[in-house]
């Protein structure tokens, strides 16, 4: 008899068939309490859980006594109570490698779009404001040869450093929990403390997960240390930044502009002051959002769950200690 799983994300037919070859699959639209109650027997017997974005917490786990593995279609997992899973000896699988290059492309795009004011001037053209040769009021700033500061030198940070160093001749500074010798050797990246990075970088790019230590790591003090000509990019997690402090820094001219893929509350409120600022490029958490990469993430998550329920957790496991 096949193990049973709960699937709370729509998958392409070929990936769904791959799951069904190994498991009895119950598809649900979400993990809301009413959904769990409606499918109580399926949740109670499920050994696997696969999907994205929904909260996986102790209350849900209480309804899933047979659960052995959860697989998220993402690299981040701040919506999952990992400690609760580990205490139950439930492994959590994620998809860290398949989205690296695509997210780095997104960060680079935010840097270019923000510095060259692409969105702002494109909207002005559409509004009929381009009636003569443009002057300084339409100008942006250069990206090439400017100093890039990367906060979080993981896979994505490395891919961004590669683009900046080889493609744009940018000196690279970085701050991370530990020094990254490969970054220093390949890209001549310079490790420094956060204050130094903020003071010297022309672009401050944040690529951090959300943890107790990183929540509101960037606030009024940090923005005050940045150059008034600096551009701030956040492509990690929204709550790493105190959004009110960022808004104030932009309004007061403490920094030049911001390119934001993530926000404290998502979707971003239509009343957010960020949406009325011409020096802000705000996009809806599109970091990995290409057809190719999202498919690859789903395929990776499917394979992760198949492997995990066969006891294979050598790669992509967040909490391997749970298997002990």
Swiss-Prot record:
It is an enzyme of class 1 (oxidoreductase). CDD domains: GDH (cd05301). It catalyses: glycolate + NADP(+) = glyoxylate + NADPH + H(+); (R)-glycerate + NAD(+) = 3-hydroxypyruvate + NADH + H(+); (R)-glycerate + NADP(+) = 3-hydroxypyruvate + NADPH + H(+). It holds the Pfam family 2-Hacid_dh_C. It is found in: Cytoplasm. Its main location: cytoplasm. Belongs to the D-isomer specific 2-hydroxyacid dehydrogenase family. GhrB subfamily. PANTHER family: 2-HYDROXYACID DEHYDROGENASE-RELATED, GLYOXYLATE_HYDROXYPYRUVATE REDUCTASE B. This is Glyoxylate/hydroxypyruvate reductase B.
């Amino acid at each position: 008899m096949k193990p049973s799983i709960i699937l709370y994300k729509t998958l392409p037919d070929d990936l769904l068939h791959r799951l069904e070859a190994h498991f009895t699959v119950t598809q649900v639209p979400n993990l809301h309490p009413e959904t769990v109650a409606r499918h109580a027997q399926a949740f109670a017997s499920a050994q696997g859980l696969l999907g994205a974005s929904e909260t996986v917490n102790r209350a849900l786990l209480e309804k899933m006594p047979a659960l052995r593995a959860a697989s998220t279609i993402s690299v981040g997992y701040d919506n999952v109570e990992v400690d609760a899973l580990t205490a139950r000896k439930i492994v959590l699988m994620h998809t860290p490698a398949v989205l690296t290059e695509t997210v780095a492309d997104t960060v680079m795009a935010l840097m270019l779009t923000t510095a060259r004011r692409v969105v702002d001037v494109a909207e002005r053209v559409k509004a009929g404001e381009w009636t003569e040769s443009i002057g300084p009021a339409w100008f942006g700033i250069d990206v090439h040869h400017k100093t890039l500061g990367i906060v979080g030198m993981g896979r994505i940070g490395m891919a961004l450093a590669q683009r900046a160093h080889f493609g744009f001749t940018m000196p690279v500074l970085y701050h991370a929990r530990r020094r990254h010798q490969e970054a220093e050797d390949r890209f001549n990246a310079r490790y420094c403390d956060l204050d130094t990075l903020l003071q010297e970088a022309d672009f401050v790019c944040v690529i951090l997960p959300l943890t107790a230590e990183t929540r509101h790591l960037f606030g009024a003090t940090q923005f005050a240390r940045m150059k008034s000509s600096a551009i701030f990019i956040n492509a990690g997690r929204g709550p790493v930044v105190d959004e009110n402090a960022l808004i104030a820094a932009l309004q007061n001219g403490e920094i030049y502009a911001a390119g934001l893929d993530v926000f404290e509350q998502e979707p971003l409120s239509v009343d957010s002051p960020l949406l009325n600022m011409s020096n802000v490029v705000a996009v809806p958490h599109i970091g990995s959002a290409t057809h190719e990469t999202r498919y690859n993430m789903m395929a990776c998550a499917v394979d992760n769950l198949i492997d995990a329920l066969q006891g294979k957790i050598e790669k992509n496991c967040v909490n391997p200690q749970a298997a002990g």
